[in-house]
Amino acid sequence: MGLISRSIPTLLRGISQASDATKQPDHADIQDNADSNPVLGLTKRSGLEYVANISNTTLGNVHVQTINRDVDQRFISVFSNGNVRVFELDGTERTVQKPDGTTYLNTTTPRSDIKTVTVADFTFVVNKTVTTAMNSSDLSPGNITQAIIFVSQVSDKTTYSVTVDGVTVSDDTSSDSTLSTTQVATDLRTGLAAGLTGFTFQQNGPVVHIKKTDGSNFSIDGNDTQGNQDLVVVKDSIQRFSDLPTVSPHGYVVEVKGDDTTDFDNYYVRFVANNSTVDGTLEEGQWEECAESGIEFKFDYDTMPHILIRQSDGDFRFARVDGDTYTDLNTAGTYSQSGTTVTVTSANHGLSSSDSVQFDFTSGNAVDGTFTITVTNANTFTFTASGSLTTSGNVAFGKVNNSTLPKWGERTVGDLVSNPNPSFMGKKINNIFFYRSRLGVLADDNVILTTVSEFFQFFRETVLTVVDSDPIDVAASHTKVSILKHAIPMAEQLILFSDQTQFVLTSSSVLTLTPKTANIVVATEFESSDA
């Protein structure tokens, strides 16, 4: 074959596995220890800079997540079977508090079963082997069986009637010299109290509250001869929100069903009194949208993704996302004990007498006790122990500052239909990611994204309308079974991978991704590994 001479425009295209006939002139077959840099050209690949070992033994099957908080604070987190450790880049190991234990991390294959994503100081951790669940032991606050009678207006020559458990009481205004909604309500309450046993009544102006003393159910109905325009009887539900009075028992939950003139589904409201937090207090207040009573409304935190959070002292905390408060045990010292008096020595401890301080005496990464201290000087303080401690040793402590962990959002409005559980509930979460200011998870063939900028909220905050910032829950539709395994944000798109098909999460709106505009379309169909 004759020698061919020609110019090559660049050496930066790297290697190509295409056939010789289809390769570009600047594609190479082999490139060893070279870096194709568009600024510097083809340069020698940088060598290894050895810094430190993060372990003197083989780590084995682990999941590693790099935490790049900023240019000065970078960490390596290592998740193994039932444990998590965090290291600085120089190999220094940071303390990880584990108040809820590490049962969530139990898996013999953490490299493939643990998935993580870091957002600011929070690293969200998913164990693919754990099935999510709702908390079935704590249900949304609800009603005892009760009712209110509301005389909204009064008319001359009108009869108002209320029937409770078959007992009917009426009041006729034909002979009244003065028309008063309060007087009509009083007459109805007095008549019912005289004709019924086992009931309690309370009245505030034109509103009468009625319930049975044993909390059991009862029937109630009411009418007036003005076409039922004056008298409103509420027991569990009502047609129009505008018919509800501004005086009601605190905590009373009512379903607003709507009528032919409304364009919304049913929703629920709870009465909040202005000057009381005691359920049943009958006074002025306002109605607020709420969840149906007696339903599951929050997650089982043990089964949901956990977080690895960087604390203010630079150490870390691995915990459930349950809203607990905690104190940073960010100061070290030594202690000795004489009788019940414990003396702690720590240079420039910065505490004051009467401070409430938490201590870890056992190096178990958890609080062993909380005590009120007496400062001796800038370097020592004392407290009285309730029992015997180890005579002396090292101690970690911190002033109680009640830092609060985030908490997974709850179903605060609607019911299981209007504000359903996210589709990952009852399933295993396959992966977790961050996209367009939303935290997202993959479960089966669904992509579930939180409320915009609310990384812990998977429920809607109102069911009266669909808001652009609401959570998004969409499924990948395909003739093949498409269990989504990976999600990669790229160029304003979210690329989704299943075993045999790749999808793209798109929006019918160029600028926004909303529950109304989100859509998943097929991109390519190649087999991919789950590694």
Set out the residue ranges of the language-model regions.
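Small/polar beta-strand repeat architecture
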Residues: 215-240, 292-303, 322-413
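Short beta-strand elements that form the blades of beta-propeller/WD-repeat-like
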Residues: 72-80, 123-126, 438-443, 485-498, ...
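Short loop/turn segments immediately following beta-strands, especially the blade-tip
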Residues: 453-457, 506-513
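Amphipathic, non-transmembrane alpha-helical segments in extracytoplasmic/periplasmic proteins
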Residues: 64, 180-196
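Polar, low-complexity export/assembly segments characteristic of proteins
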Residues: 155-172, 194-246, 250-279, 285
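N-terminal beta-propeller domains
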Residues: 1-93, 237, 241-328, 400-484
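Hydrophobic or amphipathic alpha-helical targeting/insertion segments
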Residues: 89-95, 102-157, 205-236, 240
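Repeated scaffold domains used in trafficking and secretory/extracellular systems
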Residues: 58-69, 104-118, 428-431, 482-486, ...
